[in-house]
Structure formats: structure tokens, C-alpha cells
């Protein structure tokens, strides 16, 4: 008879085994989401790309589909997820291309997919009908490694789908099929082998069985978001084991948290995987690009090429990027920046003769910028559950009005905000007029001096449905009146009031002039683009502000319509209402890495101090010390207005799609804002305010 201790130990072991099984299934579940997203790319992107950028085409330029065998249902993801997954496909394919291009023809290459899931990569590259993979056909073989339960399903699909069986030779020689091992498949160019990668001994045994220690064989290990769920010491043992084999390459694509676990996107991403019982583990130890380099060097790979996914996007040639921009309407650049900076692509090798060629080389290094702290201002919480983004707000008289935006659906309501010390109350304005603007976002809503009125300019419905209509809202009568439309659509532009009551409009996604002036008296729009080469292209989502005391304005950051380049300049200009031919002239241009912001908002605190808040950058993430900064335009000095640790760690914070408003109390409020964090859920701002510190 078993004693009580033995029974308790047995029960404990059963529970541990059950927990492990559940965790394994949760990790396998992440594969289902990933492969469905790649199917979305296969359906939407690949048919629209030319042969130069399509991974899957036959000799008649017909699209070959491989993901459909594992995801038969037609899937459509959001534009940001689609672009992100196209980039993931490009990441692995481009690294494999670089290896095969530099490997001598007489060398055999084996690609080992660690945690392969339902990835059809072997079938893409071995299919002799696929002219885009001709260089792989006679040179490469594949080994798929994953959990036994998952491989059983994958192998059963391979056996029952003639197209897949034929690619790897199953239909030609039944001897390769071993029905006694349903998680085990062997053909001349394709092996499927079960392995729990948490078991380093099992993995080493498998490497031996597959004869991968042969120095004449080039080994390429691919880990696309598969080691990230393992404890660092276990994933490290996998990497180290592969480094002990001559002629070995390791390609890893996984999550990154370069500004720590409390950066808003990072916090949401970590929480998402934890909720799904597949917590990210390695990323907490190897959270930066530098730490990944050190990791692979320490584990035996002397030569490492590593960068984040936006660096990969930048490395794609211009023709490819232009073609991708045409695939589907896209207006999620802030979210794309955030996604890209949270994924790392690393190619490591122990083969000293291998050269990372220019087309594949990540060579940008970013140094940390330390700023002195601005002791005059601090950021506090201020309850404002507006739950909207990409609307606009302005002060008219003693009232604050917020118009439009999305929550997540586009709206055309006007909210009246009553600002108190620690909270903001809001109510819907009941509009008297029967004719009202359509729901929209990415517009401007700007005070004009004439009788407490607000000017609504442009905006958009869907990303491909820009608007050209303009309206004036009268706060006394609560009526909308439509004014002359623009000759072009315009959204993601900026606008500010000028001392004479006119309104300056800058840039946006438009085919119109780079700068317009709305003359309130004449009720016309006039092209006032400065004669400066900087304004040859329209600036998108730039910061714009004018100071009536110094009679100068500032334009900060802003992107261009290539969706890659973002300005790192602050342009100081003056406005001369008497100069009919050239009312806007550039005085000075300042340049700084922290000016490189897309979607930031700026506001003068004093004529000698400009507040710069939020936005995203192609160069990296902002943190709690540089998300909010101040600029003295005269001395050209920058200071930090740090976000307190308590707000950074505990507050719902996302400095994208928000607005700034100054109040008569001398405070500046961050109103609205938020972003969808890729497939990890949305984050919205609750409310923040900037106050002067009493001396």
C-alpha cells in the first residue's frame, strides 16, 4: 500500500505534467494565429506583387498558394498585420537568399525549422513549379521540428494533400512513408521530427540522428518566434548546441522590448501573451539589439548581423516598397513603427568566410541621448475617459471642443470638455443644423477669431477615402455651415490659428500644395508654400504651432508619403500678413534625432519654451525620459520632462493620435489618443496634464 507521501508526490507530478501539457498547447496555439495571418498575406499581397517581389509564382506568372493547405478558410487581417507578416516572410526569405548566394554550389544546405508549426516553407522552396525558388531546388533539404501533437496533424495533411506529397516525393515512392510513426516523416529532401526543444538532450540526440555534424554540410537553423516562449537558459542551450557544428547559421526572429517592460506597446504585448498562457520569457533577458549580439557571441556565434524590423523595411529596395504601398490602403504608420521596433531579426554564423553583404547588412547604430531635466514642469494624471483617437481639439472662448475621431468607429460628434483640477467632464453638443459633416478622423478643428467659430478642414473616412469638404461650426448657434471645398482631398495635415484670425494649414496626405492659408475675411484658401526645397513634398502628421508674441511658428518632424522617411528637423518660420506674395518665410532649421517624430503634437508654453509630446519614430522607441521634451528655440537646447515611474508603469498611456490643448489656468492637457498594438489589443490614454511647478 502506498504511503501518503508517495501519493502526494504522484499527484504533484500529475499536476506538473498537466500544467506542462497545457502550456505546450498554448504555445502551439500561437502558431494557428501566425499561420492564419500569413494566409491573409498570401491572399491579398502576393497576387498584387510583381515577379520581382513575389515568393510564389509558376512559369506562367500564376500565383502558387501553399498556406491554403493549412488554412483553407479565407482570412483577412488588418493592414498593419498584413504588412507586418509580409515583412516576416521577407525576413526569413531574404536571410536564406543571402546564405544560398554565398554558399559554393558543391555545398549541401540543410534548413532546420525549429518550432516549424504549419509553416509551408519547405514546400515553397522545394516546389519545382515555383520559379521564384529555383536556386533552392537542387541544393537544399529541410528538417521540420516541433511538438509531436502538432507534427501528427501536419504530417497527416501532407500525406492526404497530393500537391504537398508530390513536392517532397511521397507520391512517387511510398517506401518513405512510415505509418508506424505518425509524428515522423522521411523523404530524400524533407524530414519531420518531433522534439520538445525544452529538452536539450533530446535535441542533441536528434542532431546526431540527422547527421548534422558533417562539416561539409551547411546548417541553417530558423527560429521564427519559437524560442521566445522558452526560459532563456533552455533556448540558449539550443543556440549553443547549433554553434558547436561547423558551417552553422542561426536565423532568429522574435520579440524585443528595447525600452523595458513598461513601454506602452511592450506592456500590452507581454500582457497579451501572458493572458494566452504563452508568456514571453527570453525577451525579458535579451530585450535589446545589443543584448542579442552579446547572446549569440557568448553562445559560440562570432559573426552576428542584427537589427529590428523597421531596419529590415528600410533595407528593401525602393521599387519593392513602392509596390507594397499600392497593395492596400494603409494609414497605420504609428502602429507599424511600434510593431517593427518590437521585433528583432538576427542572423548569426560561426563560418568566418561568410560576409554579410550590403543588401542584407544592418549597419545603423543608435546612441542613447541623455537630456537634462526641465525642473519647471511636471506631468500629472487628469481623468479624461474620452476614449477617442485621431480627432482634434481647440479652445474657443472659455470652452474646449473635441470633434470627430474614432472609438474605434469614426464619429462626427462634438464633445464639450469642462476642465477641472483633477478631471475633465464632457458632454455631447446637440447640433441645431440639419446638414452636418460626415464622420471622420485625421482632420483639423481650429479656432478662428470671427465670432467664436471653429474651422473643420478635411480628414478621411477609410484610408483611401480622403475628404476635401470644409465646415465652420458656430458655438453660439450650435450650427454647422459648409464652406468652399478644397480642390484636393487632405488628411493627416496640421493647422494653427494666426494672429490676424487666419488659419495656416500644413501638409498632410494630399496632392495639393504643401502649405495653405485660409483667409477668414475672403473665405478662400491660398497656396503659401515657402520657396524652400524642404517644402517640395508634403509633410504628413507634423507638429505645427505659432506664437503670437514672438510672431514665429515652428514645424516639427512629420513624415513623407513614402511611409519610410520622417523629418528630424524643426523649421522656424515667420508670418507676414502684409506680404501677399510670400507671407511664410523660413528663418532657421534645427536638426536633432529627437525631432524625428511622426504624429507628435507641439505647444508653446512660453515664447522661449516649446513643448514636444509623443509621436513615433522610424529610428526607435521613445521612453519615459524623451517621450515629452521641451525646446528653447533661441538657445537651441532640449530638456526632458520625464514621465514619472508611477504613471509610466501603471497609467494607460499611448502618445499617438492625441491632441494638446492649453487652458486659461496655464495647464496643457493631453486629450484622447491611443493605438492598436498589432494583434495584441488596443491602448488608450486616460488623461494627462502638464503643470508648472510652484517655486
Curated annotation (Swiss-Prot):
Biological process according to GO: tRNA methylation; tRNA modification; wybutosine biosynthetic process
Broad class of the protein's primary localization: cytoplasm
Involved pathway(s): tRNA modification; wybutosine-tRNA(Phe) biosynthesis
Phenotypic consequence of residue 88 to A: Loss of function
InterPro entries found in the cross-reference section: Gal_Oxase/kelch_b-propeller, Kelch-typ_b-propeller, Kelch_1, Ppm1/Ppm2/Tcmp, SAM-dependent_MTases_sf
Alphabetical keyword list: Cytoplasm, Methyltransferase, Mitochondrion, S-adenosyl-L-methionine, Transferase, tRNA processing
Active site positions: 88, 229
Highest taxon, organism lineage: Eukaryota
One GO MF term attached to the UniProt entry: tRNA methyltransferase activity
Catalyses which reaction(s): 7-[(3S)-3-amino-3-carboxypropyl]wyosine(37) in tRNA(Phe) + S-adenosyl-L-methionine = 7-[(3S)-(3-amino-3-methoxycarbonyl)propyl]wyosine(37) in tRNA(Phe) + S-adenosyl-L-homocysteine; 7-[(3S)-(3-amino-3-methoxycarbonyl)propyl]wyosine(37) in tRNA(Phe) + S-adenosyl-L-methionine + CO2 = wybutosine(37) in tRNA(Phe) + S-adenosyl-L-homocysteine + 2 H(+)
Entry EC no(s): 2.1.1.290, 2.3.1.231
Subcellular location: Cytoplasm; Mitochondrion
Binding site for S-adenosyl-L-methionine: 38, 88, 115, 146-147, 196-197, 224
GO cellular component, one term: cytoplasm
Family matches, as Gene3D superfamilies: Kelch-type beta propeller, Vaccinia Virus protein VP39
Pfam family, one: Kelch_4
Family: Belongs to the methyltransferase superfamily. LCMT family.
Function comment: S-adenosyl-L-methionine-dependent methyltransferase that acts as a component of the wybutosine biosynthesis pathway. Wybutosine is a hyper modified guanosine with a tricyclic base found at the 3'-position adjacent to the anticodon of eukaryotic phenylalanine tRNA. Catalyzes the final 2 independent reactions, methylation of the alpha-carboxy group of wybutosine-72 to form wybutosine-58, and methoxycarbonylation of alpha-amino group of wybutosine-58 through the fixation of CO(2) to complete wybutosine.
Protein name: tRNA wybutosine-synthesizing protein 4
Taxonomic path: Eukaryota, Fungi, Dikarya, Ascomycota, Saccharomycotina
Gene that produces this protein: PPM2
